[in-house]
Amino acid sequence: MSSTRSRRKRDPEIVIARDTDSELSSSEEEEEEEDNYPFSESEEEDEAVKNGGKIELEKNKAKGKAPITVKLIKKVCKVCKQPGHEAGFKGATYIDCPMKPCFLCKMPGHTTMSCPHRVVTDHGILPTSHRNTKNPIDFVFKRQLQPRIPPIKPKYVIPDQVHCAVIRYHSRRVTCLEFHPTKNNILLSGDKKGQIGVWDFGKVYEKNVYGNIHSVQVNNMRFSPTNDDMVYSASSDGTIGYTDLETGTSSTLLNLNPDGWQGANSWKMLYGMDINSEKGVVLAADNFGFLHMIDHRTNNSTGEPILIHKQGSKVCGLDCNPVQPELLLSCGNDHFARIWDMRKLQPKASLHDLAHKRVVNSAYFSPSSGTKILTTCQDNRIRIWDSIFGNLDLPSREIVHSNDFNRHLTPFKAEWDPKDTSESLIVIGRYISENYNGTALHPIDFIDASNGQLVAEVMDPNITTITPVNKLHPRDDVLASGSSRSLFIWRPQDNTEMVEEKKDKKIIICYGDSKKKGKKQKRGSDDEDDEDDIFSSKGKNIKVNKYQAKTTKKTKT
């Protein structure tokens, strides 16, 4: 019995002898072979697998034959390379490797499917232990802000239905979005190739793409505070562009690589950018930890670059306080978000350093009062500080959310709803997919930052790609999303559409640069992407489902 068990544990092997003497055989020899070997070769292999042993098959005993060994390898996990289990997608459901920590909360002992922080339709996101940061200063400050912050939260209005879209609008994936400050229907979008698109989603068909502004990825865009037809853009080519949206003409205000490509160790890229209207400066930060400033009245550089993060680390984002213009918030891949006083900008002179466990994708002050801080970290945590005047050593709460990603995606960034007077509603895309009627979809989550509960998750059955770039309109109930190379406009579902037949969506499909060509990574590009586009390009006729986009909302109490 012991020999039988040990034989079954070993991987079965099949040794087949090959005749190398001659390739020709007569019909008589073939008949003899059939008589001598009544079973086919495949049948012998199947029999060998069943017996779990080693079988040697010899068709001829001629000299010069080299045996061929066929080893049947057992299925192993693609993640840990161990047998006995599998990991990966099974249909529309992803199965975790039990030997690895949970992909969502990064803690061992359970899988993603059984994670207590998992976002599903039955319950919302569970916040970690809440720490009360209230002190006497906080209460005094809250009393001063009481006229601005309503005592009762207004009802959330969620844009949960795709109203219109432009498919394959950009030639590469969308990296950033920005609404026009005065024209409600104008949306700006930047992509990985350096193009900037201008789309009037009110008329749908009016759209332009300017490709002569940057050579590689557009990371940030801001409208000029003095001329709303002009826009500033920061790119991975190390330049800040100043573009006229009417004509498409652009000028370069800052170039960190005047001598061109000198190697990866010296190539500078600009990521975070914001405008301080009170100070009259455009702020931009690079991938070496330095802050650069441009006077937007003269469009000339002012002062020397200032080291605001660890030297050699990328500054991912900048945000100016909307109420107190002296305060600046920065974040980077040195695992810190930092608060600065712009009157005393010096290296290692930050007012406070907010520690994180991994790279901080974004950090924002709250849009109305400027007293709260919202950060998104790649440790799958969204962190909220309720008051910048209290104890900032630890966040007021942490929300576990799936925003870890691979390098072929634009980083996820949780953003405030600028219309929410209670400063509690945030929006962010989700990385982990959910199985909806047999289809793997990646919803967009609306979360209540005050308690971590899931307010709504919106999705459309036609959008099967991940949606990392999301922007809420500052005045209208509109959500703009960038998924792969496409743009989508979401609006709240009309009550009349629940009874009447849903109107057809306005969708434009652009085929301008849909054919895949030989890819060559450009200088300054920080990654390569080969994302699958929404709607398969194999079929000529693209059908759009007529049933409604599925939405799950939580009732507020």
Swiss-Prot record:
Residues 1-55, 515-538 are annotated as: Disordered. A motif (DWD box) lies at residues 328-343. This is Protein DAMAGED DNA-BINDING 2. WD repeats lie at residues 169-209, 213-255, 265-304, 310-350, 355-395, 415-458, 461-500. Residues 10-21 have a biased composition (Basic and acidic residues). Belongs to the WD repeat DDB2/WDR76 family. Induction: Induced transiently by UV-B. A zinc finger (CCHC-type) spans 100-117. The DWD box is required for interaction with DDB1A. Changing residue 343 to H: Does not impair interaction with DDB1A. Pathway: Protein modification; protein ubiquitination. It comes from Arabidopsis thaliana. Residues 26-47 have a biased composition (Acidic residues). Component of the UV-DDB complex, which is composed of DDB1A and DDB2. Interacts with CUL4. It is found in: Nucleus. GO terms for molecular function: damaged DNA binding; zinc ion binding.
